[in-house]
Amino acid sequence: MPEYTLLADNIRENIVHFDPNGLFDNLHTIVHEDDSQENEEAEHFNYDQVLDKSLLSRGSIVGLGLGLMSPVLGMCTSMAIGLINGGPLTIMLGFLISGVCIWFSSLSLGEIVSKFPMELHVGSAMLAPEKLKLVCSWYTGWLMLIGNWTMSTSITFAGAQLTISLILMTNSNLISEAHLIFYTVIVFYLVVTVVGLVNLKFARFIETINKVCVYWIIYAIIFIDILLLVFHKGKFRSLKYALFHFDNNLSGYKSAFLSFIIGFQQSNFTLQGFSMLPALADEVKVPEKDIPRGMSNAVLLSAFSGVIFLIPIMLILPDNDLLFTNHKVLPIVNIFTKSTDSVVLSFFLVLLILGNLLFSGIGSITTSSRAVYSFSRDQAIPYYDKWTYVEPDSQSKVPKNSVVLSMIISYFLGLLALISTAAFNAFIGAAVLCLCSATFIPLVLVLFTRRRAIRSAPVKIRYKFGWFINIVSIVWLLLSMVSVCLPTQVPVTFKTMNYALMVYVFCILVITGLYFKWGKYNFRLPLADDIKAPIPSDAEETVFELEDSNVEHTLNSGTTVKESVENNSEEGFIKVHPKSSTENPFEENEENVITDYGDEHHTAEQEFDLADDRRYDI
């Protein structure tokens, strides 16, 4: 009689050593340049390091990113969008396409963050043409900030809705239809308060919390999938149905293609949070490598785990007619109860999903508060000194005022739900619009420079893939923005209309007005460590190593010049344009006199002496 084994011997021996991060790193070797490439150079900026540089590791960035892009929480709370606009095909294929395209977007954004390891408005400032630096940086920063605030609100509010659904599972009459939104907002306020207090009082545990997040999501997926398959009472759907069935009758759209495009909203709400991670650059030891790799690994892990999570749900999916009978609870709750015919088991499954809420909520407040801090350092926000304040004797080095501001914004947006659910949903849709457009600006600027500006980035896409991945990313961002603006069902009423575009336009107008009222006179461009003249595309940098503060440089003309330079660079290098190397660098001319700050003129030697006190238009 043959001997049967559950797993092949080689799999059993090696499965305990399986590391998903290692698998994703191997995948990155296909699209990324070799890490050992020469001439790696990340831009460093002359800001005082106030936050804890060792607070987060690359693994913690992956965990925080997975929390922001949790397929368990995100796909479950927005399941109605996919079910109405096509069902399994829209959900599964839409998530796969979104996962690949958003991974491309994370790779493209990772190049910029690797070269300019700060929040995205910094990268836009460094990439933009001279006359547009201030404007590009301003719009990128504000769109990213608004996107952070609204995405944080959408995550916590979705969790509050799921909590109410959990309460109503046993008795749907506990809360009346008239008071449903009121109690949802109360739960929302509680969630925001809890995750905010964790950021204020227990920030030193965020590293551990982010790592636990990965394990929670993975085990939640395993438990939910297995329990659904084991305790399913009806007939299983075929694999063909689970992957390719399409029915958009509930949407009212005659066009199947349009319904499919609208279905991307579900995946975009889930996966767009990757662009919030660069705000954490001040709290990572090696941000030029850890942020890009952590960001793309988080997208891959979220997409991969999301597919595994969704397939069993599609296999036990009840008919749509049974899923929208009770509008007080989310469709995912009806899926569990109709499939298992057990309130107790369904209650446990929803609890596993709600566990993600804690990690996602904490991470969203963390990133939004750091976006406030980073943008305020350049005086972009009124009362910027308050938002950048960090208690010098605090153990965790957290910008507490920025955390409180992010909580207040969430509280305010939550009030909109009491006034109008359509208005609140519009702000949630605007979250994706703002994040997409804030990512769009620096990506377009990279193509505008023909990718020369990121040539020496420590993490860089291989040349043969770079243009393709950048262009696909830009097209995807535009498609995502169009998708989010469309109503999920037609015909529309005043209550069901999608007002996301109107809110987005309103945000643009406010940002523009604030620019002319405040930004034009107070906002300052990011301050780099050293002064660099513009480098033409056909020129290469000449790099001189400074052994100490007094060095003799022999110029091309044979002239020896002694320079006394205060070296602020960590690497100890100063870059000199080869075209200018034959000239006396301390002689005033059109190239070395900075005239952007009034009528006062300084030579290059004086500018080095003032490097710690002034900001430069890079």
From Swiss-Prot:
Gene3D superfamilies found in the cross-reference section: Amino acid/polyamine transporter I (1.20.1740.10)
GO biological process, one term: gamma-aminobutyric acid transport
GO cellular component: endoplasmic reticulum; Golgi apparatus; Golgi membrane
Pfam families in alphabetical order: AA_permease
Keyword set, alphabetical order: Golgi apparatus, Membrane, Phosphoprotein, Transmembrane, Transmembrane helix, Transport
Listed GO MF terms: gamma-aminobutyric acid transmembrane transporter activity; polyamine transmembrane transporter activity
Compartments where found: Golgi apparatus membrane
Record's bilayer topology term: Multi-pass membrane protein
InterPro entries registered for this protein in UniProt: AA-permease/SLC12A_dom, Amino_acid_permease_CS
Compositional bias annotation for Basic and acidic residues: 598-618
Intervals, Extracellular compartment: 85-90, 149-154, 201-211, 318-342, 420-425, 487-498
Residue stretches spanning the membrane: 61-84, 91-110, 132-148, 155-171, 180-200, 212-231, 298-317, 343-367, 403-419, 426-449, 465-486, 499-516
Cytoplasmic domain ranges by topology: 1-60, 111-131, 172-179, 232-297, 368-402, 450-464, 517-618
Region ranges (Disordered): 576-618
Family designation: Belongs to the amino acid-polyamine-organocation (APC) superfamily.
Biological role stated in the UniProt entry: Required for polyamine transport. Transports putrescine effectively and spermidine less effectively.
The protein's name in its UniProt record: Polyamine transporter TPO5
Gene behind the chain: TPO5
